[in-house]
Amino acid sequence: MDKLNFIKTEFPKLLQNLNPEAKGEWGVMKGQQMVEHMTDSVSQATGKNNQKLHTTPDLVGRYKDFAMSDKEFKPNTPNALLSDLPSPITKATIKDAIAEYNYQITAFINYFETNRGAIITNPFFGDFNFEEWTHLLHKHAIHHSKQFRLL
């Protein structure tokens, strides 16, 4: 599967069928909250919402190995940067949220085309280049697609 094509084209198509109030198979996010959460992850990959590394140096290599593997995120994988309650939605509609996701994916691709060789720190997994971010964003999109029964 072409991971970049999935996050750029296929995932947004899947989102078109998502009810903004849908409850996932696990977790507390609703449909639109998940879309906005994914958008935040994509914008982080371009250095926006930049976070320092939260993983201790002795663990970052092992964490990155997991991120680069084909092992899926487990349901309810904790995220130390998020509260136990989902963030309130910021877009008026799920269509607006999907449009923002699409905008951020394009910005992600353009950023790395303009800044070839750029490295952006992921707060859990360390320094990532374009290919590594693409792999992680794909893994993340698959995780939430399964959570909301889109796959």
Regions found by a protein language model. Give the residues of each.
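General secondary-structure edge motif
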Residues: 14-18, 81, 113, 117, ...
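Hydrophobic packing residues in well-ordered alpha-helices of helical domains and bundles
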Residues: 8, 94, 98-101, 134-137
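Short, contiguous alpha-helical
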Residues: 19-72, 119-151
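Globin-like tetrapyrrole-binding proteins
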Residues: 2, 15-16, 83-93, 129, ...
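Acidic/histidine-rich alpha-helical segments that form the ligand environment
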Residues: 68-116
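An N-terminal domain-cap segment
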Residues: 1-28
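Short charge-dense sequence patches
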Residues: 11-14, 46-61, 86-99
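Non-transmembrane alpha-helical segments in soluble domains
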Residues: 12-15, 35, 39-43, 98, ...
